[in-house]
Amino acid sequence: MNKIRAFGTLLGLFSAVGLSWPSSAQQPIRIGASMSITGKSYSVQGGYGRKGYLLCQKHVNAQGGVLGRPIEFVIYDDGSDEKTAVSLYEKLIAEDKVDAVLGPYGSAITDAVADVTEKHRKLMIAPMAATTSIWEKGRRYLIMMLAPGEGFSEGLLDLAARNGLRTLAVIHQDGLVANSIAKGASELAKRKGLELVFLETYRTSPADFSGILNKVKAAKPDVLLAASIRLEDLVAITRQMKELDLNVRMLSSAPYGLLPDYYQRLGKEAEFVYSGSFWEAGLPYPGNRDFVTAYEKEFNRAPAVQSAAGYAACQLFVEAVRRTRSLDSDKLREALLTLRTKTVLGDFAVDERGFQIGHKAVTIQWQDGKQVVIWPDELVSGKVRFPTPPWSQRSTSK
């Protein structure tokens, strides 16, 4: 089986039905998006997302495009800035006259640009936003792909309860995703029988987290959840925990303790760390293995969750166009509201708001430099290493 046919078969949504080889004379379907390629906050994550979009473009066009036309992404760098992204989506729709749009990186930027897409009645699949409140504003043309952030720590707390742990501390950045993860963890902890013994929100990311971490140390929690959309925060917190000899039975760095970059920066200091995860390379989703292989070949590095999310959003858009034989936002919306399927990201199903009800997060732990899925039971790829040993008993040299 050749590579193109393999992707068409395994990814399902790129089946040969309804596709024909695009003529060079046919105009491409232009898909606009902004992505955080630069900027201090999201450039790592945005870079992964952009590559996911571009790989999907390559595969769709290799199979003949959709409706006999190739697809072409028009992607601008929003610099990790909400106002810039708003201007760019206005430009994409009003000036560039793109045929469709897909979402940017992150809940905050997605929430901001959704006002633009709603104004123009332009459907937007949002592959990298996981905050429930975005879908509580009566928006019609916004489709969610990721599981809600409130459930991101369910696996962590389920495992904590199973192992007899009783107390939880939470520190988190003041932002849409981090707030939802922290709120969800606090509520889940009560249901699992864990007491919340410390909670602190920080608004500006400090270079030195020792003040907060010393308060955590005094609270003596069994479990610590650190939540931030800034990878730099999670790296600094983990590193400074070692410096302060702050030991917990379980540490979760959410949501980006799961990124390869987290381990690359920390080395063995990242061992035993947990994180929720919206996607993992080894999960048995249709086409996932071939997606990972193709991504590594194309970009000479492993994909991250944003790569898979961008690719999957493109998958869904192409399938909606194929089903409706249209680029009309209302028709595409109706197709997606009734679609129940699997992408490389996992299950997809939304309610009448476009809010995700099918996709579920898993929980991973860093073990010997690898992300091992340790929850839920039906998807595990290895055994949890519990408890986390004290820093004094660990070899953390890189």
Q: Over which residues does each language-model region extend?
A:
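Extracytosolic ligand-binding ectodomains
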Residues: 2-17, 21-398
